[in-house]
Amino acid sequence: MSSGGLLLLLGLLTLWEVLTPVSSKDRPKFYELPADIGPCEDFTGAFHYSPREHECIEFIYGGCEGNANNFNTLEECET
């Protein structure tokens, strides 16, 4: 690859780093966990952060166990 190509690649990577939202960089690792309904059957609405969608998504939660990527409200998930 030519030096011009390398400089272009470096510039694009730098731009991508700058434009990546700070909130997604600072999210704890449990936000990478998938939505987990859990083994119980007390079905209720809950929210989890989707790294693929870069937003909080509603899902049906069974009411027990599951994992740490589980929030009662959209507001809790987004903070």
Swiss-Prot record:
Q: Where in the cell is it found?
A: Secreted
Q: In which tissues is it expressed?
A: Expressed by the venom gland.
Q: Which cysteines are joined by disulfide bonds?
A: 40-64, 56-77
- What keywords sit in the KW lines? Disulfide bond, Protease inhibitor, Secreted, Serine protease inhibitor, Signal
List, for all copies, the residue spans of the domain called BPTI/Kunitz inhibitor: 31-79
Q: Which GO terms describe its molecular function?
A: serine-type endopeptidase inhibitor activity
Which Pfam families does the entry mention?
A: Kunitz_BPTI
CC per GO annotation: extracellular region
Q: Where is the signal peptide?
A: 1-24
The family database entries (Gene3D superfamilies) matched by this protein are listed as: Pancreatic trypsin inhibitor Kunitz domain
List the residue ranges forming a coiled coil, or say none: none
SUPFAM superfamilies from the entry? BPTI-like (SSF57362)
Per the entry, what this protein does is: Serine protease inhibitor.
UniProt family annotation: Belongs to the venom Kunitz-type family.
Provide the protein name: Kunitz-type serine protease inhibitor microlepidin-5
**In which organism is this protein found?**
Oxyuranus microlepidotus
